[in-house]
Amino acid sequence: MRPATTLISTVGTSLFMPNLAGLRADDPDPVRNRLAAAYDAREWDAVAGALATLPPTERTCGAEINSIASLLARGYAVPDANLFFCHSDTDDGRAIGRVLTAYYRRAGHPIAETRVIDGLQDSDPSRFRTEGLRNLARVVCRLVRDYGPGACAINATGGYKAQIAVAVLLGQALGVPVYYKHERFDEIISFPPMPVALDVRAWMRHSGLLALLDAEGQVPAASLAEDLADGGEVLECFVDRVEVDGEEYLALSPTGQIVHETFRERFRTERDRLLPPPVLASEKHPPKLGGHGVILRHREELRRYLAAITDGVPQVRSCHTVYCNPDLPRPLMFRLRGEEVQGTWSDGSEAVTFAVESSATTDGQREAVVAALNDWLQAHR
């Protein structure tokens, strides 16, 4: 395994509590005396400077510095690796992030930056679960996408214990090594790959719902009842249920966020292999619209929308309306109903369901067409 050139670290608060908070201003050791004074004065650059005079393996330096020192010593990362610190949405998190970036810039790392994880805090457990862990997954996935999985490693030593579980799943999904150092360990350890694989076909089937929740944050559960029923237990792993003013909403779970971020990018790079062949231009046909009330009221807008789908997605041959509902708005998305690819159009109060005829001939190809349609939809929202 080649050493990582980009290291993504979760950040906790052990540097402050109990380490620096436990120092005494009258400590006879001059370094600890400086540290105590700088910490009490909240002079974070001075804290970084004082820490730099200590061995990085000393416990006073905190979990992040200790673990990175072990990573570098064992050759798991290059000496001047890019460093990204994912810290909590708290005052202490921001302050420790500032100390760490100042410390490692002094040490010669060309990139040492922080990423605040919105919602990652311990004052609101519900927000921690529904926002914080999801946002951690989102930030780490984007860093790995920016720098490439072959260049990255995750250091999951610092922070809340739940972050370790998220980090391990991220590493499994992204193909990135994950490291952890307990305070009683002499050295850092790597988590072995798990003997399971995430299912890209499950993501393609449910890509519409996952993309919707990623974009909107929370969506009323009633508007997605059919999709939840079709998804069964697999889909339940990807979503959290949240009550807002007495109404149930759906949001992506941390696992759902990881699966969606991972497979969306994988699909975009492998779509030519997964999708059926394009339809010839001569075989594409105009949309067929029924004569029902909702369709009649929105006929021209519907015609333009269905024509744009046929023109914009190479594998689509034509679209035709199936049924409409004047009372139940549904989110715009594409899904599989049996062997039929279906989409939904809505103006926010009325909905029309339409079928999409494509060049797909197998279940896997139909699932890939659903993913391509939802990707097209996200680009045109």
Spans of features found by a protein language model:
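Polyanion-engaging groove/track-forming segments
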Residues: K161
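Glycine-rich beta-strand-to-loop/alpha-helix junction loops that act as flexible
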Residues: T157-G158
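Long, low-complexity, Lys/Arg-enriched
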Residues: M1-A151, A165-R381
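Conformationally flexible catalytic loops at phosphate/diphosphate-handling active centers
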Residues: I154
